[in-house]
Swiss-Prot record:
This is Hylin-b2. Has hemolytic activity against human erythrocytes. May have antimicrobial activity. The modification Arginine amide is found at R19. One of its GO terms (cellular component) is extracellular region. The keyword Secreted applies. It comes from the Eukaryota. Keywords: Amidation, Amphibian defense peptide, Cytolysis, Hemolysis, Secreted. It comes from Boana lundii. It is found in: Secreted. GO terms for biological process: defense response; hemolysis in another organism. Expressed by the skin glands.
């Protein structure tokens, strides 16, 4: 479960920072 949600959070946070 967590293994599938971590990538999603990392993608969202990374997108905001890399914005």
């Amino acid at each position: 479960f967590i293994g599938a949600i971590l990538p999603a959070i990392a993608g969202l946070v990374g997108g905001l920072i890399n914005r």
